[in-house]
Amino acid sequence: MVGGAPEQRQLFLQPFLATKGAPLAAFALTEPGGSANVGSPSPGEGVRTTARRVGDSWVISGRKQWISAATGWNGEGADLLTVVCRTDANVEPSRGISIIAVPRPDSGLIFEHAFDTLGHRTHLMPRFRFDAVPVPAGNLLGQEGRGLQLAAESFAGSAALVGIFGVALMRAAFQFALSFAKSDRRGGIHQIIQHQAVGYALADAKTTIEAARALSWHACRALDTAAPGALELAIHAKVFGSEAAVRVITNLMQVVGVDSYGHELPLAGLLQDAMALPLFAGGNIGVRRRQLHALMLDPAYDDLATLDGICLAENVP
């Protein structure tokens, strides 16, 4: 739990460490209008969900959407929401946005709409609102006004994970396409893998998969060891892995042919899932490339920092 004090981690994370049940947690940042502008200084833009201090409580009001797992298992809400909200609308976002942990409330959490998505259909990403939901003041994570910084830390980890998602989808598509190419003749006398065009397409796909895998692994290791270039590596893993997944799966569908367009084969579904990766957990254009641009604009930027901690074969534990 990024920003959480030890006692908060004990309180909120204990159910997730238990051997019984299957609690769900969700990170609530995105609002109607998108999340690329979360740092807008105007209270009418960016983060518009508010948390108002009333006695020993924060009272949360506002809308969120595209929040994975927010509905929970039964449509009544996730067991724990961490909510990005404005705690002070009179200062700039770098000092006026906070994150508050919200256990599933008895009332005031209202689900308004379930999006009908192209892929990732095993869980809902709804639009919902907080209707004056009170939570204890002690549920504030970290210091008041540090919400954007904490969100950025959280999204570093999620960036690397999206790179891994891309690798997983590409691997599944490659394994199917390779097996298909080795067994199917498409009406000819040879398995289609004997054709150079098919073999080269498979080779290119495997090269990209291995590159994405290595980059994602390096990013995760850098995050685990707090290496200097960890944030940049994580963003590269997200951008490269997510966009590679769409491209590689599309190319593998061409190896298989028109049958891959139907849901009788797995490739169409894998592509539908892959198409979400450049868009969520910080869109590649609206958020992630902008982050990379900002890193490179910094006068202290070191383009070799991403090499720090790189593992040589003899040093791998």
Which ranges hold each PLM region?
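A short core secondary-structure module
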Residues: 63-109
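Glycine-rich phosphate/cofactor-binding loops in nucleotide/flavin-utilizing enzymes
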Residues: 256-317
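Glycine-rich beta->alpha junctions and the first turn(s) of the following alpha-helix
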Residues: 111-210
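Alpha-helical transition-metal enzyme core signature, strongest for iron centers
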Residues: 20, 167, 171-174, 202-216, ...
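Glycine-rich phosphate/pyrophosphate-binding beta-alpha loops
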Residues: 65-72, 157-162, 277-284
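C-terminal helix-coil-helix/basic helical segment that borders enzyme active sites and/or dimer interfaces
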Residues: 182, 186, 190, 206-240, ...
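N-terminal glycine-rich flavin-associated loop
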Residues: 1-11, 35-39
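A gly/ser-rich beta-alpha-beta helix-loop segment of oxidoreductase catalytic cores
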Residues: 23-53
